[in-house]
């Protein structure tokens, strides 16, 4: 396995001849993920409930299980109700309502379209709950996600980034050549996980950087 590089540190613009496939994370690359903003929109008149939902739902112990595909929203809402006391309906509102208030990150979509124009294969690699992923990709933003050629999502393979297994599943499922692939993620440890498995990385850590890179 050849040594992987961080493209955002090595190059000012995309080295198109160096890659055949570009892999995109979803949250904060293509779709905004900002739980503190979501709870304000979902529970606008109750600051305490906003804080509790942020801690109990988005920052709570069950969230990795949603991503891994081992726990559904209905079951989780009941568990949260029994543990913390808010109504089941409140937890379901927090678990499902955020999907309706997540806006696209246009910078990420411009990058994806540019990659497609350059003849590159496009894939997804994301930690995502099944219900949320299917709502975004098959309903709310179905036309946008149609540009992708496939990918690996945590809820289906039951691995979460940055576990090695999810990158190996991506390579296998999408028939990737790691040294000809770059992965874009907003979380550095996930980028480093890809690089550990031979895939080049790109850490999206500030607004505007993808517009400058994918020109």
State where each predicted segment sits.
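Conserved phosphate-coupling serine/threonine residues in phosphotransfer and NTP-handling enzymes
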Residues: 126
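Short alpha-helical
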Residues: 37, 61, 103, 131, ...
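Active-site neighborhood of HAD-like aspartate-dependent phosphohydrolases
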Residues: 2-58, 196
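Short, acidic loop-to-helix structural element flanking the phosphoryl-transfer center
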Residues: 18-21, 89-123, 164
């Amino acid at each position: 396995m050849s040594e992987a590089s961080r493209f955002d540190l090595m190059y000012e613009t995309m080295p198109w001849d160096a890659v055949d496939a570009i892999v995109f994370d979803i949250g904060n690359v293509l779709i905004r993920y900002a739980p503190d903003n979501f709870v304000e929109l979902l529970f606008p008149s109750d600051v305490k409930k906003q804080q509790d939902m942020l801690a109990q739902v988005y920052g709570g112990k069950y969230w990795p299980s949603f991503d891994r595909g081992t726990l559904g929203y209905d079951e989780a809402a009941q568990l949260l109700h029994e543990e913390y006391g808010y109504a089941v309906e409140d937890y379901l509102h927090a678990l499902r309502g955020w999907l309706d208030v997540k806006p696209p990150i246009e910078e990420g979509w411009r990058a994806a379209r540019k990659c497609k124009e350059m003849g590159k294969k496009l894939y997804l690699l994301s930690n995502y709950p099944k219900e949320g992923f299917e709502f975004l990709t098959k309903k709310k933003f179905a036309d946008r996600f149609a540009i992708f050629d496939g990918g690996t999502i945590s809820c289906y393979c039951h691995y979460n980034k940055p576990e090695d297994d999810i990158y190996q599943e991506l390579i296998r499922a999408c028939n990737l050549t790691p040294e000809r692939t770059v992965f874009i993620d907003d979380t550095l440890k996930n980028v480093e996980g890809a690089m550990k498995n031979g895939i080049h990385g790109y850490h999206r850590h500030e607004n505007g950087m993808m517009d400058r890179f994918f020109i």
